[in-house]
């Protein structure tokens, strides 16, 4: 993305908030102050970003939401993938890997991320008719890998008789 934009003559300023929504708000405020033409955002928490993104839009800055939508801000562009299909593929992989069935954990991303609902829907559809049973479900605020590990440990307190874990985390 960056190299393509630069190749087209755009000046690119990349900021990484590291899962910290307050930091992401500060970064967007910085871009507004710098009067950027376009802000591309992978929202950590769309609800929390609403005011600052609306401010950017009100000042004529184009807003592109990448992977996660920010509700009611009328983004100029929304780029995403088929999240339900992602969940379906994860579910199918577990069904194939565990044909005899058994207990599994479902460790999902952020509870404030609409994509998580879609991934879960696809995942649960893929499990229908299989012998797999979700015995523990957890959600990781801001998609933090550390929370995923915590949820696996909590799940193991419920039962250590598992055959698999679905973890909707990029780490």
Predicted regions and their residues:
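A residue-level marker of the well-folded mature domains of exported/periplasmic proteins
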Residues: 1-171
């Amino acid at each position: 993305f960056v190299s393509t934009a630069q190749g087209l003559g755009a000046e690119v300023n990349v900021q990484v908030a590291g899962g910290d929504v307050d930091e992401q708000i500060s970064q967007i405020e910085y871009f507004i102050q710098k009067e950027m033409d376009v802000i591309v955002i992978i929202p950590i928490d769309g609800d929390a970003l609403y005011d600052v993104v609306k401010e950017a839009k009100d000042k004529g800055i184009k807003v592109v939401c990448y992977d996660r939508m920010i509700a009611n801000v009328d983004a100029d562009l929304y780029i995403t993938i088929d999240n339900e299909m992602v969940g379906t593929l994860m579910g199918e992989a577990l069904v194939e890997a565990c044909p005899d069935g058994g207990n599994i954990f479902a460790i999902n991303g952020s509870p404030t991320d609409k994509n998580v609902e879609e991934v879960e829907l696809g995942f649960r559809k893929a499990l229908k008719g299989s012998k797999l049973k979700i015995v523990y479900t957890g959600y990781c605020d801001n998609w933090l890998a550390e929370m995923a590990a915590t949820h696996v440990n909590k799940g193991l307190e419920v039962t250590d008789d598992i055959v698999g874990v679905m973890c909707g985390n990029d780490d």
